[in-house]
């Protein structure tokens, strides 16, 4: 496929999404379940689509929300349901629709305090924190986001009690149930108007930002980062973490500058991806062009997608760091510097990830656990401790505690000089990973 002449460029106003028409289509377009593209379809991470082509509309969200309520009942999940949204234009109306159904079903829901946007890792963190040391009354969550996809997209993800993306057994059940509800014209969907739903005794508000930020110190050596005075830059790309980065900088007094705090639901500040479409994809050289141009302003800089479960790292020496290079370095470092991990703890990778990871695994004597594309395949292993690391080439490296960890690891590497830092930020050949030594 050829690269668009718009790639790497800011789009003219007439090519930006028409927000009023997008929202209107969300409410007025009704899916035809006889058309495959208009049915509920859970991919690698939830249901996604656009209201313009009737693949993400109010009826989809009502049906999925009721399907989640039905699943919780049959699975015996009775704890709170943590709900978060990103900055896509369709996320707010979708949350309204979901709350109307969840409240009508008597679900204890936890919305973000002050209407704050909520990254996927913050929802996962809330679920895991609540469920710690519990065997019953477990919590789960919903993240309303289409991830890095274009501004006219909407998305709806379910996270079970392990905090990660739902596995195929769960999503297949929900998909079938949601489509059954659509086929029956939503007759079995319980719903109350939003005015009453938001004031329901089962609707609560949760401070995701504070709880997430204060717990970072338990997985990241923030004191070492502060002591090294690494000059960091962070661009949330107008996504759900827009107010998290400054909170982290203030709380831990680290040398971190947030490059863009604007929330623009057209994402007009983003340079277009290879095909001329706007995507908040931090692993794309086209969408990260602005960050790369400013690479010499910082020791290391990073950006995230709209729901902050993907990241891209920019170094002065090479610009955008290839995700597989970083994953290999992160694995090398973590398994050499986490003595509390079990000797049989494995490394998770996807089938399309670099062979560099295989070489690192052999060098450090760790078993590889290879899965299809999609972070959901890592969640059970991370939850039970059989995996120490799960990462994929879309830049979604993550550990069980917090997904901010991969973004801060380069700072930890910088604080430890020698070979690991050089590998992480120099973009040298792939076989360099084999020369790494623990520091």
Language model segments and positions:
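An N-terminal, well-structured beta->alpha segment
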Residues: 2-104, 129, 135, 198, ...
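Phosphate-binding chemistry for phosphorylated carbohydrates and sugar-nucleotides
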Residues: 13-16, 21, 25-27, 108-124, ...
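Flexible hinge/switch segments at interdomain interfaces of large molecular machines
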Residues: 34-44, 189-193, 259-265
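Short, high-confidence coil segments that cap the C-terminus of an alpha-helix
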Residues: 77-78, 132, 136-138, 296-299, ...
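Short, glycine/charge-rich beta-strand/loop segments that flank catalytic centers
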Residues: 80-88, 115-122, 144
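Short beta-strand segments
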Residues: 84, 141-147, 303-305, 390
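Short, well-structured alpha-helical segments in soluble
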Residues: 101, 125-136, 288-295
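Hydrophobic or amphipathic alpha-helical targeting/insertion segments
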Residues: 126-158, 165-167
């Amino acid at each position: 496929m050829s690269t668009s002449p718009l790639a790497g460029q800011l789009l003219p106003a007439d090519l930006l999404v028409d927000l009023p028409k997008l929202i209107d289509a969300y409410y007025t377009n009704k899916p035809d379940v006889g058309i495959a593209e208009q049915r509920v379809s859970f991919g690698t991470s939830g249901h996604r689509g656009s209201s313009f082509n009737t693949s993400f509309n109010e009826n989809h969200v009502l049906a999925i929300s009721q399907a989640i309520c039905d699943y919780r009942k049959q699975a015996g999940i009775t704890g709170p349901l943590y709900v978060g949204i990103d900055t896509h234009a369709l996320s707010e109306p979708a949350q309204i629709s979901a709350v109307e159904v969840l409240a009508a079903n008597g679900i204890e829901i936890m919305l973000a305090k002050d209407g704050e946007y909520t990254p996927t890792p913050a929802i996962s963190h809330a679920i895991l924190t609540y469920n710690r040391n519990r065997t019953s009354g477990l919590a789960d969550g919903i993240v309303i986001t289409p991830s890095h996809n274009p501004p006219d997209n909407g998305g709806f993800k379910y996270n079970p009690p392990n905090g990660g993306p739902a596995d195929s057994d769960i999503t297949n059940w929900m998909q079938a149930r949601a489509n059954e509800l659509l086929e029956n014209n939503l007759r079995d969907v319980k719903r109350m108007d939003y005015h009453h739903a938001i004031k329901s005794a089962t609707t609560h508000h949760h401070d995701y930002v504070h709880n997430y930020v204060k717990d970072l110190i338990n997985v990241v050596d923030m004191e070492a980062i502060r002591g090294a005075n690494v000059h960091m830059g962070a661009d949330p790309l107008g996504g759900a973490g827009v107010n998290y980065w400054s909170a982290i900088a203030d709380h831990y007094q680290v040398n971190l500058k947030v490059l863009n705090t604007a929330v623009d639901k057209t994402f007009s500040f983003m340079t277009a991806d290879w095909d001329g479409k706007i995507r908040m994809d931090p692993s794309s050289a086209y969408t990260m062009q602005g960050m790369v141009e400013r690479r010499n302003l910082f020791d290391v800089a990073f950006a995230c997608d709209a729901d902050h479960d993907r990241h891209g790292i920019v170094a002065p020496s090479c610009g955008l760091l290839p995700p597989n290079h970083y994953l290999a370095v992160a694995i090398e470092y973590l398994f050499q510097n986490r003595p509390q991990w079990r000797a049989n703890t494995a490394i998770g990778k996807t089938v399309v990830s670099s062979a560099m990871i295989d070489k690192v695994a052999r060098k450090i004597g760790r078993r590889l656990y290879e899965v299809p594309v999609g972070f959901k395949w890592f969640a059970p292993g991370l939850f039970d401790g059989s995996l120490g690391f799960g990462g994929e080439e879309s830049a979604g490296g993550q550990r069980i505690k917090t997904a901010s960890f991969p973004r801060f690891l380069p700072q930890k590497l910088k604080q430890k000089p020698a070979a690991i830092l050089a590998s992480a930020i120099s973009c040298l050949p792939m076989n360099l990973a084999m020369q790494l030594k623990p520091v």
